[in-house]
C-alpha cells in the first residue's frame, strides 16, 4: 500500500519564464507472501524547485534540482539524493525533440544489492551518477506516429545505453 501527499506551487513571472516548486511525502508498505526479503516500509520525502524558460514558440529549457530522502522504517537502509537536471525541448509542426542530462549524487547506507536498496536507488548506484536521454516524436501523417528514444547512464565503472523505436498507428 502507498499513501502520498503533494504540495506544488508555480508562478509565471512573464509569458516566457515560470518557476515551480514540487514537494511530496510518500509512505510505502510492501508485503510478499513468498519472499520475506520483499517486505519493507519506506518513508520518502522530495523537494524539487524547477525553472522553465521559453526562448521561442518552438524552444524551451528547464533547469531543476531535487533533494530526496528515503528511509526504510523496518531496516537499516537510508538514502539522501541530490539531483541537478537540465533539459531542452524543440517542437515544430509534426516534430518534437527533447533531451535531458542529470547529475545524481546518492549518499546511501545499507545493502544496495538488496531488493529494497535497488528500489530506493531507482536502479542507480551509490555515489555519483550521470543519466541522459533523447526522445524524438514524429507524426508521419494523421494516423501514423514514429517515436524514437535513447537513454544512457554512467555510475563510474560502466556506461549503459538503451534505445527503442516505436511506430504507432491509430485507426
Question: For the regions a protein language model found, what residue spans apply to each?
Answer:
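Exposed, low-structure sequence patches enriched in small/polar residues
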Residues: 1-171
Amino acid at each position: 500500500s502507498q499513501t502520498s501527499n503533494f504540495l506544488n506551487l508555480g508562478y509565471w513571472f512573464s509569458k516566457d519564464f515560470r518557476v515551480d516548486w514540487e514537494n511530496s511525502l510518500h509512505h510505502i508498505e510492501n508485503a510478499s507472501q513468498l519472499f520475506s526479503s520483499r517486505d519493507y516500509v519506506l518513508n520518502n520525502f522530495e523537494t524539487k524547485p524547477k525553472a522553465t524558460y521559453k526562448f521561442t514558440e518552438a524552444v524551451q529549457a528547464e533547469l531543476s534540482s531535487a533533494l530526496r530522502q528515503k528511509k526504510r522504517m523496518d531496516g537499516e537502509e537510508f538514502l539522501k539524493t541530490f539531483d541537478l537536471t537540465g533539459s531542452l525541448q524543440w517542437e515544430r509542426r509534426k516534430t518534437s525533440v527533447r533531451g535531458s542530462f542529470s547529475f545524481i549524487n546518492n549518499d546511501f547506507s545499507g545493502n544496495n544489492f538488496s531488493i529494497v536498496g535497488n528500489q530506493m536507488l531507482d536502479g542507480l548506484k551509490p555515489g555519483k551518477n550521470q543519466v541522459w536521454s533523447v526522445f524524438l516524436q514524429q507524426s508521419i501523417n494523421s494516423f501514423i506516429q514514429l517515436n524514437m528514444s535513447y537513454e544512457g547512464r554512467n555510475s563510474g565503472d560502466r556506461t549503459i545505453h538503451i534505445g527503442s523505436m516505436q511506430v504507432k498507428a491509430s485507426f
